[in-house]
Amino acid sequence: MKAFVVIATKGRSKETYTLLEYLDRQTDIPAHVVIVGSEDKDVEGLASHPSVTEGRAHILLSRAGLTIQRNVGLDALAPKVAGLDAKEWFVTFYDDDFRPAPNWLESAGQALKDSPHIVGITGNVLADGVNSEFGVSEEDAVRYLNGDKAPESHWSFAHSVKTLTGLYGCNMAYRGTVATALRFDENLPMYGWQEDFDYSSRARQYGQVVLMPTCRGVHLGVSSGRTSGVRFGYSQIANPIFLARKGSMTWRTAAKLMSKNFIANVAKTLFMIRIKDFPGRLKGNFQAVRDLMTGKLNPLHVLDI
């Protein structure tokens, strides 16, 4: 199985450079890596990385937005995979602040080779800094991967392969049959919240999407480059409703997701928890509800906030 990687980055050139270092240490080095930023500062310094100078990776710029940038990456891979059997290659999407274990790509490739019914994979996240104030440091990421630090409790932990309805966007791989046929929904702009669920939900028409415990890694959860609290809060309501309307998310899942986040935003605002902009998120929630009541709710409206 030939492995390809797409990295969409925004405001994190340093973190992306480090990820390229991790990819060069993979036991199955990717056949090619596409890095997609939205402006020069997103990719500053990356042109000097050996993977780029040696032609194993290349850098592109596009309009900003996770879904847009990932689609540009997929389109850029088209000539690289031309002539290959779509069942014999896969593409992995890593967040720029994800740190994969050395055998991540090899494990994913072997799983796809051994199990033709599997079309999508997400891995076991040993630590996830996305919900903490400062995230996980690069030094601690190494400790988690080396086993010097015990893994944190995370929903992605499992002892065996587990069938899922959605994959985790910071580390997910898809067989070529999916990557050739599907693109990310660009109606989910900017940070593209729940774009991973939408894409993997649509991928299930081609086979199973699963949690693969042997694909281990750490998500730093770096805060730079993220959407504002108000915008993110708007997306917390607008995006699930949009996906439920299009059929890639059940209304039950959407309602559970929205209520969980709304309650969390209220509680953390009242208790003045400041690790994230929870008052901003709550304001965004209310703006989305207002748009819903007036028939104007649209994920793209986040661009005007």
Task: Identify the meaning behind each predicted range.
Residues 7, 11-25:
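Short, well-formed alpha-helical segments that are part of the catalytic scaffolds
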Residues 20-60, 78-82, 87-89:
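Acidic donor-binding segment of Leloir-type glycosyltransferases
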Residues 94-99:
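The conserved acidic donor/metal-binding loop of glycosyltransferases
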Residues 103-140:
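Conserved donor NDP-sugar-binding/catalytic core segment of glycosyltransferases
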Residues 141-164:
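Short, flexible, basic/aromatic active-site loop/helix in glycosyltransferases
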Residues 166-182, 189-215:
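A short, conserved alpha-helix in the catalytic core of glycosyltransferases
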Residues 208, 212-230, 240-243:
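Active-site donor/metal-binding and catalytic loop motifs
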Residues 231-239, 250-305:
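Non-catalytic, C-terminal membrane-associated alpha-helical segments of glycosyltransferases
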